[in-house]
A protein has these predicted regions:
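A Rossmann-like FAD-binding core segment of flavoenzymes
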Residues: 104, 108, 189-206
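Glycine-rich dinucleotide-binding loop and its adjacent helix/turn
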Residues: 75, 81-84, 134-194
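N-terminal Rossmann-like FAD-binding beta1-loop-alpha1 element of flavoenzymes
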Residues: 8-38, 181-189
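Short, Lys/Arg-enriched N-terminal segments with co-localized hydrophobic residues
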Residues: 1-3
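Glycine-rich active-site loop/strand segments that organize a redox cofactor
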Residues: 47-87, 196-206
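Feature captures the FAD/FMN-dependent oxidoreductase FAD-binding
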Residues: 79-138
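Conserved Rossmann-like nucleotide-cofactor binding loop
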Residues: 21, 44, 180, 202
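Short beta-strand "acidic-cap" motif of Rossmann-like dinucleotide-binding folds
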Residues: 34-41, 193-198
Length: 206
């Protein structure tokens, strides 16, 4: 297991994030025998999957959803769900013993004479290179549109969606043709008056 960085130590790489992208980067950094550290804002392993809606499921089987080095364990039926993915990421992280500090919120990255300094509220770290693997879940993009201030109903992003029961019997418009939009629409259409809007013809439904 790689040891944590000491105060003032110059690392080869600092990775900001702790989800699957960060873990994949860490795998190859470890193989290259570089000194590195992951700084994760989450309380525990799993990245954005820890915040996914309850029925969130991958669109691909375990064998096609693995990250480098260690295959995702198979599921008994269907495709992996949220909890299975979180468990896999927890086991993956422990398997390789990556050095991770959490929870830590990064406030700035700045250049120094030696390389780059990564700042948090309580501590600084230094490295020759910094990789951002923070994803987009914590800052979802809610598009602006004319008349948005006139809408009196509820508007949320898929990042805030949790359970379909909150929309039972309501009129719901799901906007977006990606996997999230397709999966949420399929679930809501069973209990709500749901309509799905996409910019182009969707290829398939879950």
């Amino acid at each position: 297991r790689q040891t944590m960085a000491t105060e003032g130590e110059l690392l080869d790489v600092i990775v900001i994030g702790g989800g699957q992208s960060a873990l994949t980067v860490a795998y190859f950094l470890k193989r290259a025998k570089l000194s590195f550290l992951l700084l994760d804002a989450e309380e525990a392993a799993g990245g954005a999957w820890r915040h996914g809606w309850h029925s969130l499921t991958l669109f691909s089987p375990s064998a096609w959803s693995s990250i480098a080095g260690w295959p995702m364990p198979p599921v008994t039926e269907g495709n992996p769900d949220r909890d299975h993915v979180v468990s896999y990421l927890e086991q993956y992280e422990a398997r390789y013993g990556f050095p991770i500090v959490r929870p830590v919120s990064i406030t700035a990255v700045e250049r120094t004479a030696r390389g780059l300094r990564v700042r948090s509220k309580d501590r600084n770290w230094e490295a020759r290179a910094v990789i951002s693997a923070t994803g987009t879940w914590s800052k979802p993009n809610v598009p602006a549109y004319p008349g948005i201030e006139l809408f009196q109903g509820q508007q949320i992003h898929s990042a805030q969606y949790q359970l379909p029961e909150a929309f039972q019997g309501k009129r719901v418009l799901v906007v977006g043709g990606g996997n999230s939009g397709a999966q949420i629409y399929a679930e809501l259409s069973e209990i709500a008056d749901a309509t799905w809007v996409t910019t182009k013809e969707p290829a398939f439904l879950p």
